[in-house]
Amino acid sequence: MVKRIIKYVGLAVFFYLIYLAVCLLVPPLFHKTTDAAAREAFHTVKTDEEGFAKERARSVDTNLDALLWRLRLVEEAQESLVLTTFDFRDESGGQDMMAALWNAANRGVKVQILVDGINAGLFLSGSDNFRQLASHENVEARFYNPINFLTPWKINYRMHDKYLIADNWGYILGGRNTDNRFLGCYEEFYNEDRDILVYETVPGKGESLCQLQNYFERIWNLPDSRIFRKKGKGGNLVAHYQQLKQRYPEAFTPTDWELETTETNRIELCTNSIEPKNKEPWIWDRMIEEMKQASDVQVQTPYIISSKKMYQDLKAVTDSGVSTEILINAVENGTNPFGCTDYLNQKKKIRDAGVHIYEYLGKQAQHTKTVLADDRISIVGSCNFDMRSVYLDTELMLVIDSPEINAQLRKQIGQMKESCRHMHPDGALQDGSQYQIPPQEWQKKLIYSVLRVIIIPIRHLL
């Protein structure tokens, strides 16, 4: 009898694992195409007869500044704060944000926190500090699409958004998570990234802020955004906040937001859809539209993992005469082994698309997602040039019309190119003046050789 039970349990587990593998691998194979009308309807927000007011912005390009500007937003909020992030960890950078949010809640500010369910389950739900924060009467936390093995077909679809909204007068949005690799100066090795700080000249009247608030309300109220109910008082947020004020006094003085930002002609939010299912490539198609209208395009992305359609789109851009340069991490210092090994497998297809590749070998890996179209349009946010960002995850990008910001970002990319190897479409290589290849450990070479084979059947998930 016992043997029979063990046999049936074993068979049940075996068939469930097959079912799980099918749910994880098969649905993402079917890529959707964009319904332009649906995309437009999703992003449209109403305003009064006076129309939208101009918004001001600045690029935030160091991890220390990224932390400081977040703290300033939190400190000056009077009514509400919204923090949405893909990854939130109970380490120095994450604790800084928890302590600041705790203090804001003590002032009577309503705080809403939305975190992707996988990383929240792995790194956050057991945190005493986070449980203390979530226990505050003015704080509500939710996890987007937490893992549920009864609905395994949803597991692949993650929330990759990263933004912080203060009241109705300002927000910061970009590619940075809420942990030590992105906030503050807590790690020897970290990720370079970019956020955009947006300030409203007329509170509540900026187009992109209205779009972002509307987007947040939709995703916050999804049935898949589950309330975090575990409470606790064992954290150290009160003492940490006092330490925070001593460590970063510049974040706790009044800020002249207009002086610290640059005028823009327009800022528009572009998103993917929000439900945990296959996405139409709304952001990707919008970026391609902007690229096709330009004569010169500069792209920053950590890596490239393209579908057949994505290669075709890039080829259409370059065939129309648009000079297209893409800066990615060199394999030698990339922090994503799947992105690195796919690049080794796909180099010829990338060259055949007619783009110029710059392999960046700086002191740190870059995690930046930016598209510059000519000298006015800058597109910045969380969307990588990979199939996961294009077809599976929620993503956000800001389309910014500002010659000043565009010029600033072009200058930064130009400086980074000195630490790059330039691969031309014909395969010719040219090293920048500061490009130096470090010795690559044999263990890493071996791992990458194995991964180059392993990732082939699963690259549509990467």
Q: What residues fall within each predicted segment?
A:
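Lumenal/extracellular "mature" regions of secretory-pathway glycan-modifying transferases
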Residues: 142-144
